[in-house]
Amino acid sequence: MTRDGDNSELNQIKSKIQEHLVSSGNYELISKQLKLQLIESGWYDKVAQIAMDELNNSSSKDTKDGGRAYTTKSLSDLYTVVKPKAEGLVPNEVRENMLKRIELYLDDLIE
């Protein structure tokens, strides 16, 4: 099978798993658990601080009308800067818990 064929088949499998996750209610349960663990670990606060620091540091100069000019001009710009930092801040324990939960779900699905 070609590389594109492998990717297509893999995408179909991923899509079916995601559909089953959603329809079974497991997606919502896993999502809620992830959110709770991120809140408890202080991850949201850290990411919010990174975003605020980026916005504060990106103001480059005063404008003629008394405002500030920002090098981060859009939400997309901010997302591009913050996303990799936020991903790196996810505690290993949270990652491991989520991977175990997904692995258990997949094991049950296959059996």
From Swiss-Prot:
It comes from the Eukaryota. Component of the nuclear pore complex (NPC)-associated TREX-2 complex (transcription and export complex 2), composed of at least SUS1, SAC3, THP1, SEM1, and CDC31. TREX-2 contains 2 SUS1 chains. The TREX-2 complex interacts with the nucleoporin NUP1. Component of the 1.8 MDa SAGA transcription coactivator-HAT complex. SAGA is built of 5 distinct domains with specialized functions. Within the SAGA complex, SUS1, SGF11, SGF73 and UBP8 form an additional subcomplex of SAGA called the DUB module (deubiquitination module). Interacts directly with THP1, SAC3, SGF11, and with the RNA polymerase II. InterPro entries: TF_ENY2 (IPR018783), TF_EnY2_sf (IPR038212). One of its GO terms (biological process) is mRNA export from nucleus. The keyword Transmembrane does not apply. Pfam families: EnY2 (PF10163). Involved in mRNA export coupled transcription activation by association with both the TREX-2 and the SAGA complexes. At the promoters, SAGA is required for recruitment of the basal transcription machinery. It influences RNA polymerase II transcriptional activity through different activities such as TBP interaction and promoter selectivity, interaction with transcription activators, and chromatin modification through histone acetylation and deubiquitination. This is Transcription and mRNA export factor SUS1. Keywords: Activator, Chromatin regulator, Cytoplasm, mRNA transport, Nucleus, Protein transport, Transcription, Transcription regulation, Translocation, Transport. GO terms for cellular component: DUBm complex; nuclear pore; nucleoplasm; P-body; SAGA complex; transcription export complex 2. One of its GO terms (molecular function) is transcription coactivator activity. It is found in: Nucleus, Nucleoplasm; Cytoplasm, P-body. The gene is SUS1. Belongs to the ENY2 family. Gene3D superfamilies: 1.10.246.140. The keyword RNA-binding does not apply.
